[in-house]
Amino acid sequence: MALQAASFLPSSFSINKEGKANVSLKETSLFGVTFSDSLRTDFSSLRTRRGCRQISQTGAIRSQAVATTPSVNRATGEGKKTLRKGSVIITGASSGLGLATAKALAETGKWHVIMACRDFLKAERAAKSAGMPKENYTIMHLDLASLDSVRQFVETFRRSERPLDVLVCNAAVYFPTAKEPTYTADGFELSVGTNHLGHFLLSRLLLDDLNKSDYPSKRLIIVGSITGNTNTLAGNVPPKANLGDLRGLAGGLNGMNSSAMIDGAEFDGAKAYKDSKVCNMLTMQEFHRRYHEETGITFASLYPGCIATTGLFREHIPLFRTLFPPFQKYITKGYVSEAESGKRLAQVVSEPSLTKSGVYWSWNKDSASFENQLSEEASDVEKARKVWEVSEKLVGLA
């Protein structure tokens, strides 16, 4: 995504509505940016308010699973367990960074990728076009703009009885030229509702599943953005991210009882995206503070570099889409291909050297990863707590 900046003892673990854990140990980066046999899903409507454009999707998906659950093999003689294939869910895996990451992991033969996508057929075509081994991926429907869809995804995933070792929250929408807000099926401004709230609910619901994993390194990765970091040049390009006092978020981002912007200001499509990415990075850190010590799960965020050709810019003006890639390649020298960015995210998923929790990873010109600093707002502990608590209420967890 071009705008995006970038063992453990087995235990019994549960998350309550207050976001606290009950644990019982047993043995213990100018820019950078199966399904079971069948699944039937109703697409939710994306609603607009006060003259905003209406987006409606209603339909059903029915498809066969493309792979079976990998088994855990037992070594003979010594009774040791042979490491099984890892299982990773990647949202937004039908294009861009998500697809590149899915391909990079699947091609190793060491990972089974659950491609969680809104458009099943698009994802299926993308996987085939990318040459991904059929036995190493499964496509499942997920519309992050619908909380019901998120819940149904979790239920369907659990029915598959597949383990969950890593969750990658990658999907995002971006409407930089929008003058009026569009809303999700639940009435939230679309950028924040999809990029932040949808992922927030998904992560919370799947936290239990992650903790049950017997994989050596369990991880929850939320893709961040350099544009949400005001300590960078890209982060200071107007409009700058600013969550303010969260009055819009607390009001439900519905454009009726409150502003559709987190800070309560007038709507700006580009700022809404940047604000959503600040929420993503704050959420990662709050996950780390609340759950890392008790669960051993690694929580991380990243900026994989400037993917100037990404489909994330499909809503931008044509001139921008034409000039931005060569600008990044030849002027800023910050351009990163989708394939390279996918390899970087795959590193955060699988590399033993990147298990540190609470970290925001970036890459230098030599493609070496390093721990980057977040802006003052994106690392504000109290604001992270408030975003967490308000988000819990909005998605029905409190």
Curated annotation (Swiss-Prot):
Keywords: Chlorophyll biosynthesis, Chloroplast, NADP, Oxidoreductase, Photosynthesis, Plastid, Transit peptide
Gene3D superfamilies, alphabetized: NAD(P)-binding Rossmann-like Domain
EC annotation from Swiss-Prot or TrEMBL: 1.3.1.33
Protein's cellular compartments: Plastid, Chloroplast
Any one GO biological process: photosynthesis
GO MF annotation, one: protochlorophyllide reductase activity
Catalytic activities: chlorophyllide a + NADP(+) = protochlorophyllide a + NADPH + H(+)
Keyword Endoplasmic reticulum: no
Stored Pfam families: adh_short
GO cellular component, one term: chloroplast
Pathways involved: Porphyrin-containing compound metabolism; chlorophyll biosynthesis
Top-level taxonomic group: Eukaryota
InterPro entries the UniProt entry points to: NAD(P)-bd_dom_sf, Prochl_reduct, SDR_fam
Top-level enzyme category: oxidoreductase
Primary role: Phototransformation of protochlorophyllide (Pchlide) to chlorophyllide (Chlide).
Family: Belongs to the short-chain dehydrogenases/reductases (SDR) family. POR subfamily.
Record protein name field: Protochlorophyllide reductase, chloroplastic
Source organism: Daucus carota (Wild carrot)
